[in-house]
Amino acid sequence: MADNEKNSCSCSFCGKIHSEVRKLIAGPSVFICNECIDLCSGILQEESRSYKKTDTLKLKPKEIKKVLDEYVIGQEHSKKVLSVAVYNHYKRLSNLSVISEVEISKSNVLLIGPTGSGKTLLARTLARVLQVPFAMADATTLTEAGYVGEDVENILLKLLQAANFNVDAAQRGIIYIDEVDKISRKSENTSITRDVSGEGVQQALLKVIEGTVSSVPPQGGRKHPHQEFIQINTDNILFIFGGAFDGLDKIIESRHRGSSMGFEANVQKVSKNKDIFCYTEPEDLVKFGLIPEFVGRIPVITSLGELDESTLCRILVEPKNSLVKQYKKLFEMDNINLQFDDSALSVIAKKAAVRKTGARGLRAILEALLLDLMFESPGSSDVNQVVISKEMVEELMVSSHLFLKH
């Protein structure tokens, strides 16, 4: 290219001519200089770093658990297990570029515990702590592709939406799938009929959790068949599964009884243990109905115990966003000071423990307890304080009648 021609060409972005830059790259009717290329590269790298806050691993396992403690009461062992698993997962991601002879596998997690024990809250709080995109799905709504129901790819779409369709961010996110025990196959024997919501879903999930490049329809799969797909690599997405696994305790007891070789004390110890799920082995999950390949992709298994009365009482008041604090805030918006006697909280916790609905049952009881107050008190100029006493709670159990304290 002649000097005159070179100088007549300029960068389409910054306007500098060829002699003012080191390199000018030509495209169809446009030019870009090396300086603008460096600038664009820096912007892209900075944007990528902004979605990789966990790369710095500022939060160590102890610090992750400390934050979990602020929102989740009890379940100490599960919080410790999750803190270590998540820390190791993101430590693995931050060192993917480092050449190593040892390839570290992903540590997906299974949370086993009764309804209301805190499985969903733990997963959601983890995502908030780590500042990564988070998506939640119910395994009972999933079916194999081609059948009525939700495709596995729709879960990835939820994660994409949580990441504002930033693919890099989504590929480092967390997906929580609840009720995974409901997709166990109906029996250990292969059925002639198609199990589209059981083993078939496990097979579909298997491909995603072990790591694959999935084609995700941005508008939802079955309604818009001709749309363009977004490619998502699931290698580095952390999957957390949760389930109550009703009946698994019998399988665990049976295994211990069969392997005890006459040591009845060991069997009795397992049977009487409140948290029998802490003895769960992969073979128990296979016996329950999860396929071996699926179980093999979830190396971290931890159990959450049933919440007792004292823990439920703490849950009412201690977390940052506790139910008592939430209702106090609601009443405060109407210039009413809401107070609970300690004895009243104990009765509420005791009622929830009897119902065996865990922390979820606490909200239902409080809603019933405070319904009349929330209906009557707004706009009542002579009401500025409400005190919930033990007697009021006990009266609710009989007649649902409450009264106001002026």
UniProtKB/Swiss-Prot annotation:
Q: What GO MF terms are annotated?
A: ATP binding; ATP hydrolysis activity; ATP-dependent protein folding chaperone; protein dimerization activity; unfolded protein binding; zinc ion binding
Which residues are listed for Zn(2+) binding in this entry? 11, 14, 33, 36
**ClpX-type ZB domain ranges (all copies):** 1-52
Q: Which domain of life is it from?
A: Bacteria
List, in alphabetical order, the GO biological process terms annotated in this UniProt record. cell division; proteolysis involved in protein catabolic process
Tell me its family.
Belongs to the ClpX chaperone family.
- Which HAMAP family does the entry link to? ClpX
What is the protein's name according to its record? ATP-dependent Clp protease ATP-binding subunit ClpX
* Gene for this chain: clpX
